[in-house]
C-alpha cells in the first residue's frame, strides 16, 4: 500500500522499533487508536493514514516540545489524528476506550511500578482490543556495560559500580513483559526480541552520539558524584570502542489482546 506518511528512513532508532510494532499490530480502517509516548509522531502519522478518516488516533507524549513539533509537521493533514501533551501513567478517567493501544519505545518509561502502570493503561483498551508496545529490553548494549563495569572494578570504583548495577537491573526484560501481560489477563500474548546494531565511532563521536548520550550514557554519568571524574572515566572508555563494538540493542515487541466481551445469554 502506498503511503504519504511513511516511517522516516533516516531514523535508525525509532523507525526500526516502529517497523517491528507495525508488523505485530492488527489495524483496520475506522479503528480508534491510543498512541502513547508518541514523540514526534513515529508511528502515529503512519497509523493515522492506515485507519483513515473514519478512525481516530490520539497521540500523547509528556514532552510538550515534542507535541508542538508533531503538530507543526501535521499541519492541516490527517484531521482525525490529535496530538496532546499528557503522562501515559496518569490518563484522565474520562478518556474513552480504544480498539488499539500502541507505544513505540515506551515501556521502559512505565516507572516506578511498570505492572501497575500497564494495568492502568489497559483500562482504556476495549474488550477484544490489542495492545502493542516496543522497548529496548534487558541485554541492550551489554558489551558496553561489561566494559564499563570492568573499568570501574579496575579503578576500585565500588560505589559507582553498585549504582550502575542498579540501573541495569531496573531495565525491563522480555520475560517481565510477558509475565505482566499474562498476569493482567491478556490473551494471545506475544513477546519477541531481535537485535538492532547501533553504529558508533571512537572519541567524541561516541561520547556525543545523539542516541547513546541522550539516554544510555547518561546512566553512567549519573553513577558518579564527581562529574569531573565521570568525564575522565568516560573519555577513557571512548578511546576503547573497539573492545565493545558492534553495539547491539535488543528490540523487544510485546503484544496482547483483551478478552472479548461476553455475549448475554
List PLM regions with ranges:
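Class I SAM-dependent methyltransferase SAM/SAH-binding core
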Residues: 34-36, 40-91
Amino acid at each position: 500500500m502506498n503511503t504519504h506518511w511513511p516511517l522516516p528512513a533516516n531514523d535508525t532508532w525509532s523507525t526500526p522499533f516502529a517497523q517491528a510494532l507495525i508488523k505485530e499490530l492488527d489495524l483496520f480502517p475506522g479503528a480508534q487508536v491510543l498512541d502513547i509516548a508518541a514523540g514526534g509522531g513515529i508511528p502515529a502519522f503512519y497509523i493515522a493514514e492506515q485507519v483513515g478518516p473514519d478512525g481516530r488516533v490520539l497521540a500523547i507524549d509528556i514532552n510538550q516540545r515534542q507535541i508542538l513539533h508533531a503538530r507543526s509537521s501535521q499541519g492541516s493533514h490527517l484531521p482525525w489524528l490529535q496530538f496532546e501533551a499528557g503522562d501515559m501513567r496518569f490518563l484522565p478517567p474520562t478518556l474513552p476506550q480504544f480498539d488499539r493501544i500502541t507505544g513505540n519505545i515506551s515501556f521502559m518509561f512505565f516507572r516506578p511500578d511498570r505492572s501497575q502502570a500497564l494495568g492502568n493503561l489497559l483500562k482504556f483498551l476495549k474488550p477484544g482490543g490489542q495492545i502493542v508496545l516496543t522497548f529496548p529490553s534487558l541485554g541492550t548494549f551489554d558489551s558496553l556495560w561489561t566494559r564499563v563495569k570492568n573499568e570501574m572494578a579496575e579503578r576500585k570504583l565500588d560505589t559507582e559500580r553498585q549504582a550502575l548495577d542498579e540501573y541495569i537491573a531496573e531495565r525491563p526484560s522480555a520475560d517481565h513483559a510477558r509475565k505482566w501481560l499474562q498476569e493482567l489477563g491478556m490473551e494471545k500474548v506475544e513477546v519477541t526480541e531481535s537485535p538492532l546494531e547501533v553504529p558508533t565511532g571512537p572519541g567524541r563521536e561516541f561520547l556525543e552520539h545523539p542516541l547513546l548520550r541522550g539516554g544510555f550514557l547518561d546512566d553512567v554519568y549519573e553513577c558518579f558524584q564527581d562529574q569531573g571524574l565521570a568525564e575522565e572515566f568516560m573519555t577513557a572508555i571512548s578511546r576503547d570502542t573497539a573492545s565493545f563494538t558492534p553495539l547491539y540493542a535488543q528490540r523487544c515487541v510485546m503484544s496482547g489482546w483483551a478478552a472479548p466481551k461476553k455475549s448475554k445469554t
